Amino acid sequence: MVHQYQLNGYNIVLDTCSGSVHVVDEVAYDVIAMYPDHTADEIVAAMMAKYGDREDVTEADLRQCIDDVASLKESGKLWSPDTYENLAFDFKNRNTVVKALCLHVAHTCNLNCSYCFASQGRYQGERALMSFEVGKRAMDFLIENSGSRRNLEVDFFGGEPLMNFDMVKKLVAYCREQEKIHNKNFRFTMTTNGMLIDDDVIDFCNKECHNVVLSLDGRKEVHDRFRKDYAGHGSYDTIVPKFQEFVKKRGDKGYYMRGTFTHYNTDFTNDIFHMADLGFTELSMEPVVCDPSDPSALTEADLPILKEQYEILAKEMIKRNREGRGFTFYHYMIDLTGGPCIYKRISGCGSGTEYMAVTPWGDLYPCHPFVGDPKYLLGDIWKGVTNTAVRDEFKHCNAYARKECQDCWAKLYCSGGCAANSYHATGSITGVYEYGCELFKKRMECAIMIKVAENQELAAKGIEVPIELGSTCNACADGEACE
């Protein structure tokens, strides 16, 4: 399968299954578009009719171009066969290990964000803080079910996890002890709204957390529209100085500013640029997912605006990078020379199988958006996964699980998409959240274009970097989890 698009002056041709990316002139671009369904003579005639007045386009040149396209097809770099579907079929029968937990240490929050999917941290239930005993058992569950996998991921989540900070500190200390006993390596992430950040939190996170996610929606008026405290006051003025101090002391350790855009700020690039101008360089901005009747919900009329915004963002990132003031955007981080192996590209995030959410009471769910939905209760941290039917349903979530995705050029980049978004949009975890698909495909086009621009700049300096994904890193070819 081949996908062609034009963006920022580049004519880009992507071969889906090989991952090869080709940057061509407009003549070759049109030749490739005609190649599958036309003879060489038909292509030459059409191209001469369109470009025949140009001195640099001759019949001989066109036939050479057609031969080059044929060579690329023969070498598997255009219209490469899809040989991966059988791998996806095997996933449902494989034994999986648990490699990551989203630990809900607080089902309560000190903000009252009106768009919160988690009902201000309560997840449609009671307010609660996780006890140390439950947290410790959750870590034991992770160790016991991780098999030979050494690196284990734990995300301290909520609600607002810093409302249970003392327990978090005790739990991390416990995990550091268990690492030595079981030959494991825990990597922690903290997701916080920032209200409770102080020097103690900063020092702890910089010592213990592999990554930190800091919630900021961008411009003050945008952020404060939704992210208010219970007295109705916006939180921007409180958290921005805290975040700036946090990031200043963070050094080269990982962090992300994570925002949400809605119908009210479809010009969300201005929020990203605002965060960059505040000095933050690791940025992410997510589209709101909510009931279509919600006034903040994104609409069909918003879609072309959002796609244009992603293009504006990509072009500005290239510009700022050249000026020495670049920043990273999470959804544009794509590795076209290595990247994840084909097993990962097919199977996605592993929710419900390799990754689970744990409530303050020790219940297990496939991931945090499913928490509180009795249909998706997997079990608990004492008895393990007892609802094996739901787990097996999640095993089937992959790039080949949906008929609608079979002819989609982006399927090996989205890995089938987010199961939670699909469920909330369609009622099925293997449904298709079409709005999200459209945004994802535009993000991928922009991400690839940025890589093309970077490669062309390197090529101008005499540095050649081929853009082509390998099919597998072989790390998990035998069914073992990637490290």
Q: Each PLM stretch: what is its role?
A:
Residues 108-118, 366-369, 403-420, 474-481:
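Local cysteine-cluster metal-coordination motifs and their immediate loop/turn environment
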Residues 139-157, 394-396, 432-476:
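Short Fe-S-cluster ligation motifs
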